[in-house]
Amino acid sequence: MGTGFHGGFGSTKGSRIKIRIFTPIYFEGTVKVNGIVRDISRRVYQRNDINFHYIDKDTGQTNLQRMLKGNAPYGRDGKPLELHHTLQKEVGPMVEIHETTHQEYKRILHGLRGSGESFRNDKELDSQYRNFKRAYWKWRAQQYLKGENK
């Protein structure tokens, strides 16, 4: 992922065009878990292909409206984007990833931890992550409205 450039996997066969899919940013913030303030700052590799004006046919909401409420936007696969922990730890670097990609490569993407070693088994860390997700998508929407990360 490093540079955020993509010119092989998933590109048109024979294409020499480099498409910038990800932009690395540093998210800074805190959340409360059981009344305790926790630092949730981390690097996030943001997708550059989110359609903020996409309208969900079931709810009539745009991706931007979803994000302002703390929900993930829909990706090109028609499913909400997911935040993948690249090092499989909370707090750690993350990437905005399509749900279908996350599922297809689940064994590879989650191979750093053994069975039962997920941070999700820790109720406080799981709660922290869920709070982070909502805060992150709200923040991401605000960045878009300010003209940043478009």
List each model region and its residues.
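Catalytic toxin/effector domains delivered as secreted proteins or via bacterial secretion systems
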Residues: 1-150
